[in-house]
Amino acid sequence: MSNLSDLIPAGGGQNNTDFVADGTIVSGKPVILTAAGKAAPISTSSSAGTPVSFGSVGTPDYVNVVYDTSANKVVVFWMDYGNSQYGTAAVGTVSGTSISFGTAVVFNSAETTAIAATFDSNANKTVTAYRDGGASNYGKAIVGTVSGTSISFGTEADFNAASTTNIGIGFDSTANKAVIAFRDDGNSDHGTAVVGTVSGTGISFGSETAFQTNQTSSHNLAHDPDENKMVLVYKHDGNSSYGTANVCTITGTSIAFGTDSIFKTANTDNTTVAYDTTANKAVVPYAISGAGKGVVGTVSGTGITFGAEAEFNAGGSSNLACAYNSTGNTTVVSYTEAVTTFDGFAVAGTVSGTSISFGTALNFTGDVTYSSSGQNTIYDPDANKMVSAYRGAGCAVYALDASNLTATNLLGVAAGAISDTATGTINTWGSRNEVQTGLT
């Protein structure tokens, strides 16, 4: 038996059926029906495929990655040391725990650093912001269109006609705008933001607005669709390098800022952010003296408050990135183990109230995973996989704390304990389980 429709009762409470156990089953616990017609305990597991190169090994830097939900493709952006440091992109297709790439395409024929990218789900375009070494290090942005396994680009536009660095980007799906945060080297290193509007294959910008009158870095953004706000996190170099957040409101092509909220009163590195759409919370991972930490933020109006921090890695942690897994309802944090191996690791965080707890980390690659900047981890909702791209020209696909429970395979509840390969009774739908306790 492998079809759950065979178990739907005709109207009685008598549906008790014997099954062979695939794994040890605990009395009173829910079980699934396997493809082999056996009963198995609900469980989670993590696994990673073999990393696949998207460029020449050892030559990429400033690696960034987005997921195109219209084309159902992964798009990786990087600076190619093997090709005059040009800005380059490639389209990837996930299959299982592997990924294949189309031909790499140059989007900027000059030194390209500080790359940050997002996906505009309204225009179905990628938006890539970067520092253009061929144009006085101005801040530029360009729109990409994915077709099959290739990507084409429109004409670049300036978002800051001065030296620009530490670029972060996000998409506001309420206002249908791209939001770029950056350090304006042409204006005393002030933290600055600007709003971009995609039209066709081009992008235009509103006026730049400073959110700090001194130096900032490590900018990242996430959209809060519940409050219709953008959450900006950054390292406030001008204030003892504290980890800081601000809630931004987009109106037309303008951006307004709330009051800063400090989430860590210490030198904070690698600040990043994702939004948990189940818990309706912002999740902010960061590194303190190498240790990987995270906090949960609650947006209210133009302010944000934070719960207690939790640790996901006590050793060296660098190159943090995060993305929300909407199937597993977890925020996955990727990082480089920065003490001995420099391997790539990922860990899933689960939000409860204003707290977050982290599971066991998965070593998704033995390659060196350093990258100078950028959000290099995304969630592919079509394949239900995480994807991390990194400087070693590798791209790893992995499942983290993935459950064997699906929308169609829940079988019932065990009437008693069943040893692996033994036969025992399962109370299927319409039956009554009499071994439950503590349900008053």
Residue map of PLM features:
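Blade-edge beta-strand/turn elements of extracellular beta-propeller
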Residues: 101-102, 153-154, 205-206, 257-258, ...
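Extracellular receptor-binding modules and their adjoining Ser/Thr/Gly/Asp/Asn-rich linkers
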Residues: 1-74, 78-82, 88-95, 113-126, ...
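Terminal edge beta-strands and adjacent linker/stalk segments
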Residues: 105-106, 156-157, 208-210, 260-262, ...
